[in-house]
Amino acid sequence: MLIRRCIYTLADTHPAQAHMTLHPTGELEVEVAERQQHFIVDFDHVLFRRGEQGMVLICEDVAGAPVCLSLSAYDAFELYHLMEDSREELEELMCDLA
């Protein structure tokens, strides 16, 4: 199981870069330096919704309020699949340990 890191340009009116780290424990860490945002959220609290400029990544339960980040459809698709791969790796590891 590996930590995966990726950088996405947010598709907002004020573009910024979101540095995302997918932890093998099922957590997504997000840092947007331009907005002074940094948070960690469980994969179970991450949603993808169609937005006006692509897809919206919704991270629930972040300091009591959801955080929404606009991604291109391609970037959202890639992130979704990276999260699914991490989930599968974690499930395989847990089964092997049982």
Question: What does each model-found stretch correspond to?
Answer:
Residues M1-A98:
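Positively charged, low-complexity terminal tracts
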